[in-house]
Amino acid sequence: RRRQRQMCIRDRTTVKVVTSFAPEALYRDATGKTMIVDPGAFTRPGGAYEDGAFGPEQILCSESNLYPILVAHKRDFYDKNRDYRRGSLFTDRALYVPEVLFSRGGDVRRADVLVIAEPIRAYALENHRSERECDKALADRIETIFRVAAANGAETLIMGAFGCGRNGYPVEQVIELIQNWIAEHPGAVPNVVFAVPRMHADAFREAFGAPEPERPAPVVVAEGENDREGDDEDWRNVELPEGVTLR
């Protein structure tokens, strides 16, 4: 399967849109010091990872040593978050984990991980939070992500469609906030890779430039090699709820 992607230049910021999961984007698309956004659970290390859940955070945990690190911060980070759920909007309080080890086929890579909760607009409105509060929470969260990446010298930032899908924010709103930040801070984060589900990929592609032309190339597959990417194809069309996962 050929992965569709695109690249555009925003002054000194290079933007790519891919439909792979974040760990794969780390190996295929990242350059230099990399920070990956983990849209993590606010009060539970790894979310429902131990229960076999399958979502962005659980994928990161399954391909790295991230999970035991999160568990070690249960008392000083997660437990203290319990009083600040804010009707499912949560706060900008984040956990920065440097040099997480990722392993794939014997190839070990390091990347910093920013654990920061997505505001859940759909639940917040049910909990009598206003539209204005919901919009501000998303804007503040995205601002925090990019500022943390820039402050820590990240050369590549990998993030998903933060706040979209089940969280209830329109993809256009998320994209506009990101575009504005990049336009106001050109080159502050040199490379941004959006590893997004297929259901949001077209919107990100439209916003961040035309796709690179596909050029057919011969592919040699070793006999008996598993077609892992083929297995992943349909999963990217599914908007998985937090706490429901395959492993």
Regions flagged by a language model, labelled:
Residues V37, T156-R166:
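Glycine-rich anion-binding loop/nest that anchors nucleotide
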Residues R2-I9:
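Short, small-residue-biased leader/transition segments that mark boundaries at the very start
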Residues A22-M35, P39-N152:
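Glycine-enriched loop-and-adjacent helix/strand subsegments that border the catalytic/binding cleft
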Residues R1, V148-A154, P170:
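Extended, basic/helix-rich recognition subdomains
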Residues V108-A111, I116-P119, K136, E143, ...:
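Divalent-metal-activated hydrolytic enzyme cores
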Residues M35, E155, P190:
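Short acidic/polar active-site loop segments enriched in Thr and Asp
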